[in-house]
């Protein structure tokens, strides 16, 4: 199938409709010489400042003077192009040009536009949150190596500009970009309309209706209506006024296109500051009368009507003669505008009844088109506002650490949303205080303000007069105290406004909108204020609603930033406090030197390899030397290259970080470590466990109860302590013990693991955590069933990691409960210490928490100790040591001691039962009575 051939005109039309494709092609295929020629030609074209020569055949009508006093025909349009040439004999249509610029619109279906999909944009949005370093060119490419350096550099810069990763804000903007485009239908040419007017009025009328029905842009629609009305009634000038302020009850007739000449070929430039607007008060003049009463006014001689205002004629020199004014209604009959035709052509003729009928037929269609365009404009405005609010949220989440930065972003967004001259944010000094006092003020002026206003603003800020006015602003104080927004349309007419301060500042305030800023707890933390809309109008209800919605997000952002600042200060205080505590929690240099120089007794002298070691045989210093001996005896100092001075310092600091509680103190930690050492050396576990595992369990034993407070995990949960809030209610204390051990290791001069390899260090810290957490009896109950089954079935395998983990956990528990394996006198003494500590916890539960403690913590039930010890041994201790004996028979002396101690507790329990029975018998009661007598 042969490809269709395109002529140059079709290609040019296609590129006009799709400029992004042309730009893409130029960026990829354009040459430097082409760009230089383009720059040279256009710089020459812009060099002459004189008027351009007029086009041949331009009608005299195109050179007539409009009421604004400017030439219509002989200049250039907004884009610098000359006006189009009218049809010869164009007087038939009142001198209307052939094809004005708005007639050259094209159907933009957008099918060939290159757009990133929503999915890809979302991915880019997520990727932009991370920091990437991208190379924007391929270092291996050498095809352009022969080009001049300037050209290579220029190409690299172009690539860099187009390939750098976009910011989060840009990607969000692309994601929120509206995919709804205004349909653009090219209207029929004016000369064709003139032809239809002469030969087929019905078709002529339908063409005019069709052209406005397809236009949803209010500006171009208004301009079309003016031109078409001029064309229909042969008027020299035409104006269109639209009703504004109906919702607020203050109607005004506003026209951005006033007295448009029928021969104007281009759509006039609209001013961003609405300098071309003409406002007519409701009910004033002929326009206001028609708008208020809805009547048609047809005046042959305007100067004979008392309602006519000739001020415009005096200013422009244009004389108004005949005038036809008619209301424009919406589909429900509401007046939404007024159309005015001036000076019937030929000059001096009045507008006829036929003109009135034609306008009456055409304006209802105009009303429908205007209503649709206004509805579309309102929806676009709401979309832009919603989009702006989402961008505000993005700004707030991107910056939550610096109050000044986030407030500046807020003020910049507020100015963009509300198009105001100034924006202020004032923050309260104390949100809890009933007295309103602002402590901080932030001010931003719009860049669209005049230079004089900006200079006045800078001078007032330098003199601090305006800052003082902000801090002592009575309107802001009122809003902060009542929590209600204030919207003042005319500041000088409002008694709440301080006019003197306004005059001193040199900035004239016309309108004020001030709303409170709330935090997440619905407390007022400040106020936000905007002044003077750029268009000169007061802030309306829509502005107020938008500003209040905007300030909700701003309040959350400011509150988060303030909270971050408070957390940052708290963190700094905590760092200082920890620094002070770590200084006092570490041992002194004299202590380290003392043990560093001391002679360490042998294992046999200390008897630390005995399973039945006396827990109370060594004093606090002797326990340090014994711990040093254990490290040396196990070969850990040599194997892991532990600095001896560091080891001494670490042991002394660990001892110092145990609290002076009755049982869970340094002596208990040492005794647990001693029993682990004895089991490793006596039972031969030293040959089964790796050196890293041995180091982990020895260090774990010494650190397993660091900073113990004498209360258990259940008490932490019941009391809602800081530890429970920090670590949760699962193994609360054990997590704290591990973290405390890590803190000591990370302190300067305490890292006994400093010479380990990276892998050894990582493995060791994981094993250390497992060892300390294993002392939680909850975890013991979870894992012991599996351990017992493995042992009873003979399926235990030292090569399986999970089996080794379970075994180490059981060893830690066996050592932690090891007092029950000691001789009776030692075991009983330890049991009494544990019970005393439990009783102190029970007393706190009763006094502080108003709870009745369980039997083991209840001092009033201390005589039940033997029974409780029997339950303890039978349910927890005995099964564990029985299983360990099955693993290694050398541990049988421990099991025998448990059985012996159980029999002792059984004897005490039986004696208590006999005593209880005897005290409750009748004979004992009689004996007691006789004793009393």
Swiss-Prot record:
Binds 2 divalent metal cations per subunit. Site 1 may preferentially bind zinc ions, while site 2 has a preference for magnesium and/or manganese ions. Its EC number is 3.1.4.35, 3.1.4.53. InterPro entries: GAF (IPR003018), GAF-like_dom_sf (IPR029016), HD/PDEase_dom (IPR003607), PDEase (IPR023088), PDEase_catalytic_dom (IPR002073), PDEase_catalytic_dom_sf (IPR036971), PDEase_CS (IPR023174). It is found in: Cytoplasm, Cytosol. Belongs to the cyclic nucleotide phosphodiesterase family. It is linked to Primary pigmented nodular adrenocortical disease 2: A rare bilateral adrenal defect causing ACTH-independent Cushing syndrome. Macroscopic appearance of the adrenals is characteristic with small pigmented micronodules observed in the cortex. Adrenal glands show overall normal size and weight, and multiple small yellow-to-dark brown nodules surrounded by a cortex with a uniform appearance. The tandem GAF domains bind cGMP, and regulate enzyme activity. The binding of cGMP stimulates enzyme activity. This is Dual 3',5'-cyclic-AMP and -GMP phosphodiesterase 11A. It comes from Homo sapiens (Human).
